[in-house]
Amino acid sequence: MKKLFIVLTFILLSRYIFAQIVAGPMLGYVEHREAAIWVEVDAKVGKIGIEYWPKTNLQNKIIIQFKGELKNRYNPITFELPELQMNTAYQYQFVIDGKAISPSKIYEFKTKDLWEWRKPAPDFKFLFGSCVYINDSIYDRPGKPYGQNPIILEKMADTEADFNIWGGDNLYLREADYSSASGIAYRYSHDRAALELQRVLAARPNYAIWDDHDYGPNDSNHSYGLKNVTYNCFKNYFPQRNYGYNSTEGIYQSFKYSDASFFMMDDRFYRSANELPDMLDGKPNADKTYYGNQQLNWLKNALISSNAVFKFIVNGSQILNPVADKECLRSYDTEFKELMKFIQTNKINGVVFITGDRHFTEMHKISTPGFYDMYDFTSSPITSGVYAVDKTKENINPTRVEGSLFIGNSYSRIGISGPKKERKITFEIFDQQGQLKWEYSINQAQLTVPK
């Protein structure tokens, strides 16, 4: 009887402690010697720490206590784990109010390897997608729920990959959300707590940008009055090494993985209204901005100085689609031409755009004489409603890669593989059930300026 009592007490205590975790854990960035781990705890929690150790050395445990304020309505927390060993698997667990969570709640990550000047660039794969709508009937529009079957998030967790990139509209602020700071905080916390999200967020590192719906109202621009609130919320829920540049606000950033660089763009914070005229007095409207001068200059400097074989520009809306609606960089003629001219004039190899937003998936290829073909791969939506683009004028699109159009809930996996100077990118589209629907490869030579 005493043994049974002890077992029951342990089970109840473990359940109580784990119930104090509202959402998470989520892996943020993971570098060679540092990693970020995110979690959100209940308002009742008075103290939380993280205990971590090399997987092969259980005796070498380190505990970091959270020093910030707790017991707020919402308590998103980021632990930064410093001075890690390279190319090493670590395990971790949380300690809440002095008690460790059940051993079944031990999580794992692995730091990056130092491969440069030592070995070939590692092959890798990452998941990419956009538009995650979590139903919340109190605040949703009447009628059929807009959010689709969240089982796709479980399928993403089961799909082999090294990290995730969330391509914007990672949640949807409703009218009752984006009208107040408390509404915004509620939406970020509510959607992050979705049960189906937890495994995919804990499985591997996560990187993210936003688009209009996690920034503010539909098609929102730099005039949105609470953009600093959503900016801070985004940073609190997606921990990265840095955001913006030189004290400039915005969620743009970059990171490198193996021999690829990722330039994560902010297409909202400095964006002019779509409705502003594209032309003034017969000339492009130079005041109609998309990225803004500082962000665009940051991108130029980052691109021209990058030694990566592949340079992925990640954006919330499409870049190259010539028949897209107003939500495309191509509709912002001045900045679009400036960026394309810069890439071509400076003969920057390996540039590929990966984008979200459209509620269908496709790839565009644009040919320019004397330069390599440029690609824009769009992956959308994960759980949001699907857009029947095949019933619109966009159904016939001369730049769409044949077979790439997929209309349905989906996510994508992008892989980089191959020997030195013969690297290739492989794009894969998976449906709601995790079934492969389309595959396409581009080799390094195809993304190299002709000599």
Locations of the language-model features?
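Bacterial Sec-dependent N-terminal signal peptides
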Residues: 1-22
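Metal-dependent phosphoester/phosphodiester hydrolase catalytic core
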Residues: 20-451
